[in-house]
């Protein structure tokens, strides 16, 4: 059987500011449940409760599973790697407390705060990519 899940970003809860206000986590979870989704991604840290007991209860009463979390890290910048590790571990501890070992982390480049990337979304050209030094830092950060 295929199970389908969604993420708070589908309701406008994003790691970077966009126009408008995102719905609160209760509405998002209610609508996920009513639509028939079986699980959710965590969303940005603080969007859903960060107390594992509270989060587990919110998910349980809607019969939803916590599948994973998106953790953005500015991978091309070595100075952010230590903080990225801390963020990933903080999220991993919450996921483990709520669902055990089944959820996963999606480690992604935090390019949502890079104006050149956001202003050219969907139209990024090769010249806007990383240079050799940034690729090396990116690879180190991802490993």
Name these PLM-found stretches.
Residues 1-100, 127-143:
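N-terminal pre-domain/capping segments
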Residues 95-127:
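Active-site groove signature of glycoside hydrolases
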């Amino acid at each position: 059987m295929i199970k389908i899940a969604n993420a708070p970003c589908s309701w406008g809860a994003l790691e970077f500011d966009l126009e408008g206000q995102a719905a609160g986590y209760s509405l998002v979870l209610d609508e996920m449940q009513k639509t028939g989704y079986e699980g959710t991604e965590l969303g940005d840290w603080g969007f859903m409760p960060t107390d594992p007991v509270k989060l587990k209860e919110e998910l349980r009463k809607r019969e939803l599973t916590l599948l994973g979390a998106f953790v953005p890290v500015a991978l091309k910048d070595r100075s952010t790697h230590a903080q990225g590790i801390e963020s990933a571990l903080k999220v991993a501890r919450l996921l483990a407390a709520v669902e055990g070992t089944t959820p996963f982390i999606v480690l992604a480049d935090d390019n949502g705060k890079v104006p050149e990337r956001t202003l050219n979304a969907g139209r990024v050209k090769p010249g806007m990519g990383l240079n050799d030094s940034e690729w090396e830092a990116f690879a180190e950060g991802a490993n």
